[in-house]
Amino acid sequence: MNSKILWKAKKFQKNKSNLFKYEKFLFSKYKFKITQNYNTLLRWSIKNPKKFWSSVWDFTRVKGIKNEKLEKSKIFYKNKFLKNSKLNFAENLLSKNDNSKAITFINESGIKKNRTWKELNRNVDKLIVFFKSIKLKEKDRVAAYLPNLIETVESFIATSAIGSIWSSC
């Protein structure tokens, strides 16, 4: 069987890709050059897992406390990368705070509702204030029986922001 390439990215498209940006980041940090070759990056990540995962954390600008500890195992999926690092999902999710669209909701009747990042942040902040007023705290559990609405997402994010555990159906 002869395989035919169906599509190939143009140079300007490659240069706008996240892989290209990550390549530039790796070169600036480690002087490692992958020249837009995925297999080169794959081999490097396997050979240097500690550097790879640390660089992914830095490149994606994760907010939190990074511990570069690596607990290796002979069984790949049992490796523990960045062990004991700490981050807050909500803090990372809500790093944007402008008027661009954050969430679009469309119900079964076709009614559409949007939230901007600014609105999402404001609503989550209000919920956090409320949750704290009722003494909800880290490791508490919140179980909800709610429909798939923007307000449900906001409640989940606010719960996560204070370190509580969210469960819904």
Show where each model-derived region lies.
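Conserved AMP-binding/adenylate-forming core of the ANL superfamily
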Residues: 40-44, 103-157
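Anion (oxyanion) recognition and catalysis
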Residues: 160
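Flexible, non-catalytic linker and terminal segments flanking ANL/adenylate-forming cores
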Residues: 1-92
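Structured binding elements
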Residues: 163
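AMP-dependent adenylate-forming
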Residues: 30-32, 90-116
